[in-house]
Amino acid sequence: VYGLEPILETMLNVSIVIPAWNEQERINDCLLNATRQTVMPHEVIVVDNRSTDSTVAVVEQFMKDHPEAPVKLLHQDDEQGLIPTRDYGLNHATGDILGRFDADCMIRPDWVEVVSGIFTEDPDAMGATGPVMYYDLPSRHFGLRGDNSTRKRIYRADDGQPLLFGSNMALRATAWREIADEVCQDKADVMHEDIDISLHLLGKDLKTVYCPRMIAGISARRMDTSPASFLNYMRRFKNTFNAHPQHYRKHKPEILITALYPVMHLLYPVWQKVLNTADINPAEAAWINEQMELA
């Protein structure tokens, strides 16, 4: 099982790359979770992309308050967009393994340890992903089990190779360098950039793996978008595979996700009011029990 071997001096180190655009609400919690780990990451790189809110100030304050944390702040101001910002961070990272997730993601306290273990134990693994827990929905851990059972079965391409999920993914640095100049820049912004990375890896016969113990908490805020916006987002699955006709898939995750949308669209704002009334920060509380065990 991936990630179960004891941590040794030979374990590969892990850089974390977090693209950020106007993420003042969640970036501090994201950094707390990224640095409250059983194994400290080699570095945590926040790449700001022309934020107009206080994202930069929040990150700078975090670095001041936590000088021992290996957090770095970079700026990608040449071009607005997730892909150039992501690429800038990955290209500047210096670790053996490059973790990448969004600024509203709260990784489990053993995430770095598990990710390091995956790639250390399997030298053929070039990309890795795992399930997610929706921290701002009720029954979070039940949702995690559901996500795991579904994602490991249907989030795949070609002959069953796992597709990486942008909210919870890692690449071997050598693998990234092999595809960095080839990944789609998607100027029209119509594709899923994480699936695009996955397909470029598979196109070079580079192995991707799925690890149930590689867990990240993410927001379900996508369910709060308008029906038109949501359906447009779902079309990105098809658009990405259409851009890579040499690859195929047996399952279409967007069908299941779209089926869940009506109920989740109604539930999400109601649950946010419950959390606000109770003065609960769901991102801060995502892994509080696990973090207490580290204290």
Question: Which residues fall in each region the model found?
Answer:
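Conserved donor NDP-sugar-binding/catalytic core segment of glycosyltransferases
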Residues: 110-141
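A conserved acidic beta->alpha catalytic loop
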Residues: 33, 48-57, 78, 105
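Short aromatic/hydrophobic "clamp" motif used to bind/position activated sugar donors
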Residues: 98
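Terminal low-complexity segments of carbohydrate-biosynthetic enzymes
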Residues: 242-295
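Glycine-rich, basic loop-to-helix element that forms the pyrophosphate-binding segment
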Residues: 76-93
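Acidic donor-binding loop at a coil-to-helix junction in glycosyltransferase catalytic cores
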Residues: 188-197
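Short, flexible, basic/aromatic active-site loop/helix in glycosyltransferases
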Residues: 130-131, 142-162
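Short, well-formed alpha-helical segments that are part of the catalytic scaffolds
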Residues: 23-36
